Amino acid sequence: MILVKDAIINGKKQNMLVEGNIIKKIGNISNSEVSKDETEIIDGKNCVLIPGLINTHTHVPMSLFRGVADDIPLMDWLSGHIWPMESKLNEKIVYAGTLLGTIEMIKSGTTAFNDMYFFLDSIIKAVDETGIRSTIAYGMIDLFDEEKREKELKTARESLEMIKNLNNSRITGALGPHAPYTCSKEILESTNALAREFNVPIHIHMNETLDEINQVVERTGMRPFEYLNSFGFFEDVTTICAHCVHLSDSEIQIMKEKNMFAAHNPVSNLKLASGVSPVLKLLENNIPVTLGTDGCGSNNNMNLFEEIKAVALIHKGVNLNPVAVTAKEAFEFGTKNGAKALNINSGEIKEGKLADFVLINMKKPYLTPKENIESHLVYSFNGVVDTVVIDGKIVLNAGKMVNIDEEKVYELAEEAYFELAK
């Protein structure tokens, strides 16, 4: 059991009892409800307790790519810098990068993430050790080559079977075809079939740049969402579409009809000058918006509080509308909506929800006066949290990682980067 005492929970000072990995009770808790010998006490005095943040689009091992290629367009960034470095990846490098990235996420209040990358054994090992929650997909790219396609699909299937056999509720699988401009029709059709077979979501990059959209139009005569919809890619599956920057009205209608989730990455899209997603149109069509950081190579951090602030500000400015995205909506993009997208019973602090939560010390200049804490968490907070509980276990205590030696991880990360950069 965990007993949180005297924290600000849902707007008022109260206690919260966790039993196993579930929030059992919020409010007044009697001594008879608590097993003294088996209960960890968290002093919530001067703290606000919030649901853990959920990052719905990232490439966690790319924490090692931080700062390697700034201030260039996406295609130059990929072909000139990222893909050449990724050709040097190995299990050791991905493990170090994942450890580094998960520590960064936990220490900034993220309790779950949706990832697409390579060397999944190494990602899973790091996720298991740090205690974070994750949905993981092998990133498939066949570049329209049949031999490559068969290898990618084989690896994807093996990855899903491996994750299923873990029988770990914190680690779930997904399918991750990279994008319509890097994947053949055949691999995309097979992706849908695999997703239905394993009952997992599809995680895919969609309409990030004008250039990639033009590539798909030139090859198929249709825009990306129209093209994928023409052969049933979105049928009977949950699809999490990363970016969604340049969308036609017909594509928005397809997203609405097929109940898709948009994973908005405002900071990455701004840094790569990709554009700004039409979030207001998505909301008008009841398309759920979630938030992602993307990888550190294009952000350059994994602090989801920055995305929450960015989404609240950008759409006000672009639309000349001060209520375009409210603070409440922005916060829910990073919590409640992300939980729905990844089918996690969290994103809110309620009895019966998973015990994935964060405590933040309000005795900070940027969180004062505390009476306006809901505003501060969106507009003035820097993301430095005090305590993180995931799946009913304390993984960050007073700002210190519980399961991992941080100093050793930083050493591993420096060694891994040296190997990547040489």
Curated annotation (Swiss-Prot):
Q: Which reaction does it catalyse?
A: 5'-deoxyadenosine + H2O + H(+) = 5'-deoxyinosine + NH4(+); S-adenosyl-L-homocysteine + H2O + H(+) = S-inosyl-L-homocysteine + NH4(+); S-methyl-5'-thioadenosine + H2O + H(+) = S-methyl-5'-thioinosine + NH4(+); adenosine + H2O + H(+) = inosine + NH4(+)
The pathway is: Amino-acid biosynthesis; S-adenosyl-L-methionine biosynthesis
Residue spans making up a coiled coil are none
GO biological process terms on file: S-adenosylmethionine biosynthetic process
Q: Can you list the disulfide-bonded cysteine pairs?
A: none
**Where do the annotations place substrate binding?**
86, 178, 208, 294
SUPFAM superfamilies, alphabetized: Composite domain of metallo-dependent hydrolases, Metallo-dependent hydrolases
GO MF terms on file?
5'-deoxyadenosine deaminase activity; 5'-methylthioadenosine deaminase activity; adenosine deaminase activity; metal ion binding; S-adenosylhomocysteine deaminase activity
User: Which EC class is this protein assigned?
Assistant: hydrolase
Question: Which Pfam families would you find in this protein's record?
Answer: Amidohydro_1
> Binding residues for Zn(2+), per the UniProt record?
57, 59, 205, 294
**What remark does the entry make about the cofactor?**
Binds 1 zinc ion per subunit.
Describe the task this protein carries out.
Catalyzes the deamination of three SAM-derived enzymatic products, namely 5'-deoxyadenosine, S-adenosyl-L-homocysteine, and 5'-methylthioadenosine, to produce the inosine analogs. Can also deaminate adenosine. The preferred substrate for this enzyme is 5'-deoxyadenosine, but all these substrates are efficiently deaminated. Likely functions in a S-adenosyl-L-methionine (SAM) recycling pathway from S-adenosyl-L-homocysteine (SAH) produced from SAM-dependent methylation reactions.
List other remarks: SAH is a product of SAM methyltransferases and is known to be a feedback inhibitor of these enzymes. As a result of this inhibition, organisms have evolved efficient enzymes to metabolize SAH via different pathways. The pathway found in methanogens differs from the canonical pathway, it uses the deamination of S-adenosyl-L-homocysteine to form S-inosyl-L-homocysteine for the regeneration of SAM from S-adenosyl-L-homocysteine. 5'-deoxyadenosine is a radical SAM enzyme reaction product which strongly inhibits radical SAM enzymes.
Which protein, by its recorded name, is this?
Answer: 5'-deoxyadenosine deaminase
- List the source organism: Methanococcus maripaludis (strain C5 / ATCC BAA-1333)
Q: Which gene encodes it?
A: dadD
